[in-house]
């Protein structure tokens, strides 16, 4: 019953890494960010504005996190999201945190979302601060405390392939030792 949690900063490569780990392990990927985006779209609210809205409506985060915990308890899943690893740590075999400089993350988000570099920079830094405040208020979790993670990867100067290789190799090695058999 393999459970891998991938968390990190906006634009750090969480979804890319989590998707590849899920592919290698042949398990589903559950993305908290996708669920959060879907909720914003249903309410007709801009994604960044929805983050602000969620700050005064903790039930939004709690519903997303409850879904993540339920999937983790069921096992055989890769979970991805900003807070995911902290929430599912008791059930996770491996927790990975991805980070990158604000400039690099802004460049990635600008390319991914078709935004200006300035707009993307504002978004990644503002989202990170909104997330930090929200998670501290709702759960008492400081997302700057990375002590729960088995692996922390700075993706600033890594190619996508290198970041994936490091994360997948670590995950496969850890799971093979934990379960005393080749997992990947």
Swiss-Prot record:
Keyword Ribosomal protein set for record: no
E.C. numbers: 2.7.4.25
GO biological process per UniProt: pyrimidine nucleotide metabolic process
Top-level enzyme category: transferase
Pfam family, one: Cytidylate_kin2
Gene Ontology MF annotations: ATP binding; CMP kinase activity; dCMP kinase activity
Compartments in which it is found: Cytoplasm
Database matches in InterPro entries: Cyt_kin_arch, Cytidylate_kinase_dom, P-loop_NTPase
Signal peptide residues on this chain, from the entry's feature table: none
Cellular component terms (Gene Ontology): cytoplasm
Reactions accelerated catalytically: CMP + ATP = CDP + ADP; dCMP + ATP = dCDP + ADP
Positions annotated to bind ATP: 8-16
Keyword ATP-binding recorded: yes
Keywords from the named record: ATP-binding, Cytoplasm, Kinase, Nucleotide-binding, Transferase
The family this protein is said to belong to: Belongs to the cytidylate kinase family. Type 2 subfamily.
Protein name (Swiss-Prot/TrEMBL): Cytidylate kinase
